[in-house]
A protein has these predicted regions:
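Alpha-helical scaffold segments in soluble metabolic enzymes
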Residues: 29-33, 52-59, 99-102, 168-171, ...
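Active-site pocket-shaping loop/turn-to-helix segments
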Residues: 18-26, 38-51, 91, 111-127, ...
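N-terminal extracellular/periplasmic Venus flytrap/periplasmic-binding protein-like
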Residues: 44-139
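Conserved beta-ketoacyl condensing-enzyme motif
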Residues: 1-6, 70-87, 159-160, 180-197
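Phosphate/pyrophosphate-binding loops at sites that engage ATP/ADP/AMP, CoA/4′-phosphopantetheine
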Residues: 34-40, 137-141, 170-185
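Flexible glycine-/small-residue-enriched beta->alpha junction loops
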Residues: 1-34
């Protein structure tokens, strides 16, 4: 006896016992849960953060900052030449505060603050990192780009899953004997502006 949902969001195979214990909020709903917990982070603040992210991404793309990080992918077409995808398609050049303000809440119709504009899109991508020991790196003649000094995991209630990195970051910094101010560059997965803020 199986219940299944055809969806890109949320649970495909809901477990009624898990639903009783934790709820079955989809990711966008968990972002709205965070917004309810943090009412001082307004829709306008979320939109401003999202706008800045789009602007920074476009500036980085235009300056070639990702040129060595993105491998072009060739996609055969039924007719004509293959389509070459070599640029992140998510950042929008025409994003503005006025445009973002016009978007309706996507996950909570009444009083919601999370929209398609201050959320990440549903798009495909992939990433790879080669991790080796210092000895193996030397043996292969590799020049390291980074060194792992600490790692950590942290759990949070599923209904606010987007806050998990906060506790994990604090634990990793403590293990490394570092403070956030000691870090020169932070790469943040901005699934939702509310989560990042």
């Amino acid at each position: 006896n199986l219940t299944a949902y055809d969806t890109a969001l949320g649970w495909r195979y809901p477990n009624p016992h898990m639903k009783e214990m934790y709820g079955t909020d989809q990711m966008g709903e968990t972002a709205e849960n965070i917004a309810e917990m943090k009412p001082h982070i307004t829709r306008e603040l979320q939109d401003a953060f999202a706008l800045r992210s789009h602007q920074r991404a476009i500036a980085a793309i235009d300056s070639g900052r990702f040129a060595e990080e993105i491998v072009p992918v060739s996609i055969p077409q039924r007719k004509g030449d293959p389509k070459i995808v070599d640029t992140d398609e998510r950042p929008r050049r025409d994003t503005s505060m006025e445009g973002l303000a016009k978007l309706r809440p996507a996950f909570k119709k009444e009083g919601g603050t999370v929209t398609a504009g201050n959320s990440s899109g549903l798009n495909d991508g992939a990433a790879a990192v080669l991790l080796v020991s210092a000895d193996k790196g030397r043996a292969l003649g590799l020049t390291p780009m980074a060194r792992v000094v600490a790692s950590a995991v942290a759990g949070v209630p599923p209904r606010i899953m987007g806050l998990g990195p906060v506790g994990a970051t604090r634990k990793a910094l403590e293990r490394a004997g570092l403070k956030l101010e000691d870090i020169g560059l932070v790469e943040l997965n901005e699934a939702f502006a509310i989560q990042a803020l």
